[in-house]
Amino acid sequence: MPFSNSHNTLKLRFPAEDEFPDLSGHNNHMAKVLTPELYAELRAKSTPSGFTVDDVIQTGVDNPGHPYIMTVGCVAGDEESYDVFKELFDPIIEDRHGGYKPTDEHKTDLNPDNLQGGDDLDPNYVLSSRVRTGRSIRGFCLPPHCSRGERRAIEKLAVEALSSLDGDLAGRYYALKSMTEAEQQQLIDDHFLFDKPVSPLLLASGMARDWPDARGIWHNDNKTFLVWINEEDHLRVISMQKGGNMKEVFTRFCNGLTQIETLFKSKNYEFMWNPHLGYILTCPSNLGTGLRAGVHIKLPHLGKHEKFPEVLKRLRLQKRGTGGVDTAAVGGVFDVSNADRLGFSEVELVQMVVDGVKLLIEMEQRLEQGQAIDDLMPAQK
């Protein structure tokens, strides 16, 4: 849990080596970077809101690793964390985001007209398409560190802004604490709502404090545009629908996001953003675009093929299980999405998914007919 700074001062009575965590059995990005020397250098520092290096790393100390993915092992508590603790965050960001340097500049492109194709992914294979991102509101602490009052203020601001959306984006807000157990579970099963805070990453970082206070979901009337409020990020914006029309999903995503930003600006609030890291979010893995464009895709043959992991790697894609990050694939259905977030624009990332998914379908069709796929192996993107 985030501590007050008087507690941090108390800890400074012990030498740094006595406070250094045991990372000997760990496999996450933080554990690769954090040395006793770096810990000693950073441990007396804190951000203006009181977030310390111990708060940054706690989730990675408590969660040594993950069987499916290399976790990051740290979080930011506020916008300043990435600057105050940059000696820790910069190498983690470089490691996680394919060599992204502290001097690199991020690019943003939320113009759906720049996406080539994407309206014709075969619905016999692509069951659903989804694009999501996160946004943080400048001037508030991030979920690992925010107070109840901050969280409630974020909810109020967000609901006011979202209630101004109209046309096919018009919808309503559902506060988590006023939902029945059955309503919650139905939304979770339909992939509309974030899970209950059982994830050790959420729990250890302090993001689940006061649950379900000031958490909720806003969605439009046909449930194709959703905003999660106060889960891992202040806002998670999601556009989704059945079938393979990624172009339509991305267009709705860009339009909705642009309108939300305009509504916040009209109330004199802006999103956390800087030219180097792009949009600032709680987890360093989401910096930049924060964007994950994914499809649920049926690949019963390719999914079992020994080359499948290599194909995904070359296409800069990653797979998750059917139910998300902590789950296995059911019935040969995979959640396939872009592996990158930072250093590429939104349009570039969605383009990689569209082009990559087309190739995956072509490979699956070859394997259905008992043919080889060696000649279809892509070059490394």
Swiss-Prot record:
EC number: 2.7.3.2
Cross-link (Glycyl lysine isopeptide (Lys-Gly) (interchain with G-Cter in ubiquitin)) at residue(s): K45, K101, K107, K381
PTM-bearing positions, type Phosphotyrosine: Y125
UniProt key word Transcription regulation: no
This protein's record includes keyword Mitochondrion: yes
Primary location: cytoplasm
Top-level taxon of origin: Eukaryota
PANTHER family tied to this protein: ARGININE OR CREATINE KINASE, CREATINE KINASE B-TYPE
Comment on protein domains: The internal MTS-like signal (iMTS-L) mediates targeting to mitochondria thermogenic fat cells.
Name of the featured protein: Creatine kinase B-type
Organism: Bos taurus (Bovine)
Encoding gene (name): CKB
